[in-house]
Amino acid sequence: MVTIRLARHGAKKRPFYQIVVADSRFKATGRYIEKVGFFNPTAQGQEEGLRLDLDRVGHWVEQGAGLSDRVAKLVKDAKKAA
C-alpha cells in the first residue's frame, strides 16, 4: 500500500521531516516515490515551518494512498491556512 508519511532528517535534537509518498514496505527514511513537502517543527520567527503541495497530495489520495496520522493533521492545517 502506498502511504504519505514523514521521513525524519536533520541532526540530533534538531528534527526536520520530509513529507514523502512511499510504499509502506520501504523503510521510513529510505526509498520513496515522490517528495510532496517538508515539515520543520523547530521553526522560529520568519522561518517556514510547513510546505506542502496540496495538489500532489490530493492526486495521491485519489489514487488510493493513505495518510499517516501526523500527515493528515498537517494537511488539515495547511488547507485551513490556504
From Swiss-Prot:
One Pfam match, by short name?
Ribosomal_S16
| GO cellular component terms listed in the entry, alphabetical order | cytoplasm; small ribosomal subunit
GO MF entries = structural constituent of ribosome
Alphabetical UniProt keywords: Ribonucleoprotein, Ribosomal protein
Q: Which cysteines are joined by disulfide bonds?
A: none
Family, per entry: Belongs to the bacterial ribosomal protein bS16 family.
- HAMAP family assigned to the protein according to its UniProt record, in alphabetical order: Ribosomal_bS16 (MF_00385)
Report what the protein is called: Small ribosomal subunit protein bS16
Provide the taxonomic classification.
Bacteria, Pseudomonadati, Pseudomonadota, Gammaproteobacteria, Vibrionales
Q: Which gene encodes it?
A: rpsP
